């Protein structure tokens, strides 16, 4: 086991300093958009923003949940901004994005959990940037009747919802969520709109056992999930859940090999893998792998 008191060399990244990084930062600030890159203190922000790739966080910057792994602010959220979908579409245009990733905080205070706001954002982008592919990373819409239908009908190219961790750790790491609700959400999106690629991710290093990770893989395939991401959990602050283990690159390769035997179209498993890391390139690979599988049937 790697010493958890300091981050190993394979986790360290260079500080962002490119002109493209600052251009992206300024544009996001000027359009008054939130990003999960900043709010969740993502280690890949320098690389992604230098490539003009940012994951926009809609529905405000305050979450109604308090997951032990997440750095996003929690509390009473702001009122919905009706102009946010238009500003988001403007940012996509100005950044000339081929692929955009949209995520959000949890909004348990809203009747549909924010599903219709996601749909409005998708529609605005489709109108102004019809060639841009759209990936959404949503909350679980727990006890929000009709939300899954709204999302499925909005037809994103990729629907992502993260299970985050193994079921045995939900009470301590993700107490406001339900593992089987997350699986059901993923399964129902695929059932309602089979043409949408589905994706889910989890963190390791929180104390889970290998056999539990493998069971999550099986559960996700049972839900017809196409793409699995696995990355190292990093503690945002001392008040968050502790890192129990730094999983080595070799162990990540082992997990990737196992996952590939399960039938996923795509697997990304590295210490720095995050849900939207290299999402644009991965979407192209996802389509290629789908076409290869289709041709072999």
Curated annotation (Swiss-Prot):
EC id: 2.8.1.8
Its required cofactor(s), as named, are: [4Fe-4S] cluster
* Annotated positions binding [4Fe-4S] cluster 2: 63, 67, 70
* Pathway as given in its UniProt record: Protein modification; protein lipoylation via endogenous pathway; protein N(6)-(lipoyl)lysine from octanoyl-[acyl-carrier-protein]: step 2/2
Q: Where is the Radical SAM core domain?
A: 49-265
| Family matches, as Gene3D superfamilies | Aldolase class I
Q: In terms of one coarse class, where is the protein primarily found? A: cytoplasm
Compartment(s) of residence: Cytoplasm
Catalytic reaction(s) noted: [[Fe-S] cluster scaffold protein carrying a second [4Fe-4S](2+) cluster] + N(6)-octanoyl-L-lysyl-[protein] + 2 oxidized [2Fe-2S]-[ferredoxin] + 2 S-adenosyl-L-methionine + 4 H(+) = [[Fe-S] cluster scaffold protein] + N(6)-[(R)-dihydrolipoyl]-L-lysyl-[protein] + 4 Fe(3+) + 2 hydrogen sulfide + 2 5'-deoxyadenosine + 2 L-methionine + 2 reduced [2Fe-2S]-[ferredoxin]
Name the PANTHER family for this protein: LIPOYL SYNTHASE, LIPOYL SYNTHASE, MITOCHONDRIAL
Q: Which family does it belong to?
A: Belongs to the radical SAM superfamily. Lipoyl synthase family.
- Can you say what this protein is called? Lipoyl synthase
**Species whose genome carries this gene:** Rickettsia typhi (strain ATCC VR-144 / Wilmington)
